[in-house]
């Protein structure tokens, strides 16, 4: 089996263990799966880094049959020296934190307590670097206790043993030579069962890998020589857009900033950051309401921090009536307005319009951004949507729009498009692409979905970059042309209407017209006959007084 197949098998086994203890698709299952998976990843990563440390002591670890035993046998002094030789991006684990140590403790009756204490001790000892935080600066630890999710206390120790059993016979070591694409596919598989944020729930959408790749490549380019870039996602979800963006720039050449209100998303984002080696960005992964309490501010704390790149796949509609008044009281920030609170169906409030404004406000004067929006927005005729459209066209901020296939997102049946912004306003034309007919259909569970093929991704990227007009696919238009069309960013409204001409003789034309007339005459005659027959049948109907 390949390392990818083995990793997927591990995920399946962990999920099966949860199901066996009554937590299959339980609200807490994702906490267990993501944490245990991450624990195993960090355990193996720690061993890998020990073996490759720049220290004479590391040779002893590397040559040992079992690195865990060799590490445990070191004196406290030598162990500390070895730990100090590691990168700050590597969590420090003591011998009693290791999976091998837990394995040897399984016969103890209070193994659930031992297991949980190990988790919390790792989190406490690495809290300085390996924590995220809330908008109120409350630290969110790396790990938490897990066995209490098993309701029956008598089964908790057995549950902990079952989890450890799944970890001992697998190693991530071969995966540490892999790169972004490997971990992106593993992460997508890991969270697919938890990607169920339907009904407009806030910011738990997972952006398909292909869409994230398109957004990153079009914003950054394929060979950009960038350094010290700051990237931001105000509705980060599980971090897919940010991972694609950082990979495109170069993980070592950018810092990631994020915010999201969801506790679940924060846990998964943390996992995603660690899998992709973005440990330094953990401190900027904030849990909290971006619109009400944006955490990332300028140095003086008086305005929003501005970034080189901003990406977002926000919730489209949701009930934010509880905070609407606070947002509406900030007209300078929400310059196009904030949706009113309706009397009914508050869950239909178009919160994405606030996120568009926030994205634009968060871009540097030379910054670029991209945001996923419902396709209906790009042809809006009035309201907040139209005011935003007018602003981004008049200011020359929008430089592209790609309309995606339907059912390409797991959590919404809404047709979506991606808007691209450049605050430097240097584009002469706007490239509009209609990719709605692209994609191959596939079934996931009971859902019929679509995904873009690799060749289709390449076509979208190359057409966009070249600002190329392709029949029934793309068009490059000036800002004045967009204004003449009522500020529409729909590619279809700019396509030329083509009339196909067929070269035929006058005799062929006359014969065709005679045939059409004959067919229509016969059909009209039949229609009249049926009309008379129906009326005759209706006239024959009488009311029967004898039926009681």
Predicted regions and their residues:
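Generic recognition of flexible, low-complexity loop/linker segments
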Residues: 19, 273, 292-300, 358-359, ...
């Amino acid at each position: 089996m390949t390392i990818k197949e083995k990793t997927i098998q591990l995920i399946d086994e962990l999920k099966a263990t949860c199901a066996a203890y009554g937590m299959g698709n339980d609200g807490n299952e994702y906490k267990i799966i993501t944490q245990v998976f991450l624990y195993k990843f960090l355990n193996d990563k720690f061993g890998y880094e020990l073996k490759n440390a720049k220290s004479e002591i590391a040779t002893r670890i590397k040559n040992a049959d079992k690195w865990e035993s060799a590490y445990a046998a070191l004196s406290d002094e030598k162990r500390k020296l070895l730990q100090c030789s590691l990168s700050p991006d590597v969590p420090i684990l003591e011998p009693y934190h290791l999976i091998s140590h837990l394995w040897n403790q399984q016969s103890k009756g209070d193994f659930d307590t031992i297991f949980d204490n190990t988790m919390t001790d790792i989190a406490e000892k690495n809290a300085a670097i390996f924590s995220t935080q809330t908008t109120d600066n409350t630290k969110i630890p790396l790990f938490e206790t897990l066995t209490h999710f098993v309701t029956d206390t008598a089964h908790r120790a057995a549950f902990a043993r079952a989890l450890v059993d799944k970890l001992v016979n697998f190693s991530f070591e071969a995966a540490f030579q892999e790169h972004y694409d490997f971990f992106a596919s593993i992460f997508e598989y890991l969270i697919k069962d938890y990607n169920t944020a339907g009904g407009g729930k806030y910011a738990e959408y997972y952006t398909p890998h292909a869409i994230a790749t398109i957004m990153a490549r079009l914003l950054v380019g394929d060979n950009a020589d960038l350094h010290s870039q700051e990237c931001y996602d105000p509705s980060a979800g599980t971090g897919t857009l940010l991972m694609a963006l950082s990979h495109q720039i170069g993980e070592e050449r950018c810092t990631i900033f994020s915010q999201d209100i969801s506790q679940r998303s924060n846990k998964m984002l943390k996992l995603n950051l660690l899998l992709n080696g973005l440990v330094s960005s953990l401190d900027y992964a904030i849990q909290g309401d971006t619109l009400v309490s944006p955490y990332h501010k300028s140095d003086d704390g008086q305005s929003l921090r501005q970034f080189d790149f901003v990406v977002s796949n926000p919730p489209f509609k949701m009930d934010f009536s509880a905070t609407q008044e606070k947002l509406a009281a900030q007209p300078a920030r929400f310059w196009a307005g904030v949706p009113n609170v309706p009397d009914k169906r508050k869950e239909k409030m178009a919160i994405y319009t606030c996120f568009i404004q926030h994205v634009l406000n968060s871009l540097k004067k030379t910054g670029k951004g991209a945001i996923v929006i419902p396709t209906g927005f790009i042809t809006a005729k009035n309201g907040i949507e139209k005011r935003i459209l007018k602003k981004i066209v008049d200011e020359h901020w929008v430089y592209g729009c790609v309309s995606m296939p339907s059912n390409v997102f797991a959590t919404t049946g809404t047709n979506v498009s991606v808007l691209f912004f450049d605050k430097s306003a240097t584009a002469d034309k706007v490239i509009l692409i209609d990719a709605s007919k692209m994609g191959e259909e596939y079934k996931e569970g009971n859902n019929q979905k679509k995904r873009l093929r690799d060749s289709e991704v390449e076509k979208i990227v190359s057409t966009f970059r070249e600002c190329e007009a392709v029949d029934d696919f793309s068009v490059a238009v000036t800002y004045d042309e967009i204004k003449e069309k009522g500020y529409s960013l729909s590619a279809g409204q700019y396509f030329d209407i083509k009339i196909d001409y067929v070269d035929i003789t006058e005799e062929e034309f006359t014969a065709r017209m005679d045939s059409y007339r004959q067919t229509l005459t016969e059909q009209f005659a039949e229609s009249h006959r049926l009309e008379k027959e129906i009326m005759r049948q209706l006239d024959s109907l009488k009311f029967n007084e004898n039926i009681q």
